[in-house]
Amino acid sequence: MVRAKRKLDHIEYALSTGQSRTHGFHDIDFVHQSLPNSNYDTITCETKIGELSLSSPIFINAMTGGGGEKTLHINEQLAYVAKQHNLAMAVGSQMAALKDESEAASYKVIRKVNPNGIFFANLGSEATIEQAERAVDMIEANALQIHLNVIQELTMPEGDRDFTGVLQRIEKIVLNSKVPVIVKEVGFGMSKETMQQLANVGVTAIDIGGQGGTNFAAVENERRQRMLSYFNNWGIQTATSIIEATSTNNNLSFIASGGIQTALDVAKAIALGANTTAFAGYFLRILMQDGIEKLVDEIELLHTDLKFIMTALGAKTIEELQSVPLVVKGETYHWLMQRGIDTAHYSRR
């Protein structure tokens, strides 16, 4: 019951605290193309995460599950939306269902709604090989997300305090998993050093989960008697984290998430090097406040606007969008220079 109550608290406080929008994309400007030589009607948006082919560079990221009927209904609606637009979708952490079988229905519902969809299972980094296998089987997942949430756990009144052995557990899961493993942050971003460590143990896909979206430190602080306010602005902004990711020069696939709300955010994230983008809090807010059909319509508009932007840039495919020229400026530029990451190549390609 404690875990289920926490799941419901997370939804309530995530909606009430909102998204910070400090993702850093305001520091990214496209170089205008007066002769784009493009046609809106021939723009395609297919992409890949590792070996997984996706029809869209937008997917529904991990949000909830394990909180009884309310979270079952949310996942049911999100699965319907995913089916309408042929989007991939991740569920929230399934540890609740591994601890309490009665909560499994709140996750399994997605396969009932969308039998042929692409779904990602989800567990924390404390998971064992056996738990990872059970989570994948529970929803017949196409991939497994392992989330890293140190700051959330430290801020959570009942959270973990021991983070030793995490990389070793991830390596074991990667070696034994029958589906691709995606390691994700939850709103605090990832450094290039962290991503290189993950690549070294066989991880092939990372969701950078940057600062700028739902702030789980703020969410957990709402549940505390004594706030740890110093964690409320902790993390690496989304745009910065994407560039840190691409600077590692390995074969990782990257998912950009963290405050992404518009087609321009999507386009900038992909142009910086992401393979796809993920929406969570923004979609949840629309669903809860405006209803399921409004969310279906919003995603349609996102795709339309993304194709407009790609047309303006002369990018006929997602792969071409990844190589359009842009300029990195402001706080993002200064952070990256201090980190020894040169951004000039973005403006000269």
From Swiss-Prot:
Its main location: cytoplasm. FMN binds at residues 62-64, 93, 122, 184, 214, 258-259, 280-281. Its EC number is 5.3.3.2. It comes from the Bacteria. GO terms for molecular function: FMN binding; isopentenyl-diphosphate delta-isomerase activity; magnesium ion binding; NADPH binding; oxidoreductase activity. The keyword Signal does not apply. Pfam families: FMN_dh. InterPro entries: Aldolase_TIM, FMN-dep_DH, IPdP_isomerase. Keywords: Cytoplasm, Flavoprotein, FMN, Isomerase, Isoprene biosynthesis, Magnesium, Metal-binding, NADP. SUPFAM superfamilies: FMN-linked oxidoreductases. GO terms for biological process: isoprenoid biosynthetic process. One of its GO terms (cellular component) is cytoplasm. It is found in: Cytoplasm. Gene3D superfamilies: Aldolase class I. It is an enzyme of class 5 (isomerase). Homooctamer. Dimer of tetramers. This is Isopentenyl-diphosphate delta-isomerase. It comes from Bacillus cereus (strain G9842).
